[in-house]
Amino acid sequence: MSNKTRLDLLLVERGLEQTRQRAQAMIMSGLVFVDGQRVDKAGTAVPNDAQIEVRGNTLRYVSRGGLKLEKAMTTFGLKLDGCICADIGASTGGFTDCMLQNGATKVYAVDVGYGQLDWKLRSDERVVCMERTNARYLDRDQIPDELDFASIDVSFISLKLILPAVHRVLKEGGHVACLIKPQFEAGREKVGKKGVVRDPDVHLEVLENFLTHAKDSGFTVLDITFSSIRGPEGNIEYLGYLESGDWVEKTFDLQGLVEQSHAALDHGKEGAGC
């Protein structure tokens, strides 16, 4: 019988966190120390009798994804008080949680998966849980409300296929914050081992294509920045801020943005997360 257990499971067993998802988020946030040493990989096997400490502020949201939307709100000046929103690619519900904590009155939590949304959110009357729903085919029959805001955090599918659907359910002048993930936007031949895209030139190409996809889908791109939290396996990701309506030409220093993101994240200033 093994005398070691995954760190995320141990956190739950010892009552240091309520769910495995939250335990994983806490670990990847760098808040967990085992025998005095920081461990930031949730799957690390540690001795069953190890001393485990949680240091610093615990996570405000049900998953670390909420921190990504929090940064978008701060950077883009987003206000969600009284808004009807959608969380596209909700998963555990970090974005949904962030929306509710910032005043959203209703959130449609959309995900192609099943059984992932945190129970706290699943049982919240302000949340409409839309599991087993492919966001690519969203329409007004599924979301009858006119949405003020939508977030997009999807994997294994390009934003090129998601943005037109989001445009269909968003009101004119509504806003979108979306994660731009090079590993799912670049061609397969440009994705490295373990699904990581490291080449800055590929990142630049992805961002240029994103501007085109947004315009073709009926959006104006208001701003772009990089996410201070890397994706799984350490991928650098970007955040786009869009408005539904006629295209307004704006100029972005995409080359400078890519250089800034690599300078900030390639040197380990932020850990990988989900």
Predicted ranges, named:
Residues M1-A50, I84-C85:
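A basic, amphipathic helix-loop patch mediating RNA/tRNA/ribosome contacts
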Residues D81-S91:
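Conserved class I S-adenosyl-L-methionine
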Residues G93-G94, G115:
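Glycine-rich SAM-binding Motif I of class I
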Residues C98-K106:
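Conserved S-adenosyl-L-methionine
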Residues T105-L161:
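S-adenosyl-L-methionine
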Residues K160-A177:
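A short glycine-rich, Lys/Arg-flanked "PGG" loop and its adjoining helix->strand segment in the class I
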Residues P182-D199:
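Short, glycine-/aromatic-enriched active-site segment of Class I SAM-dependent methyltransferases
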Residues I236, Y241-C274:
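Flexible, glycine-/basic-rich loop-and-beta segments that form/coincide
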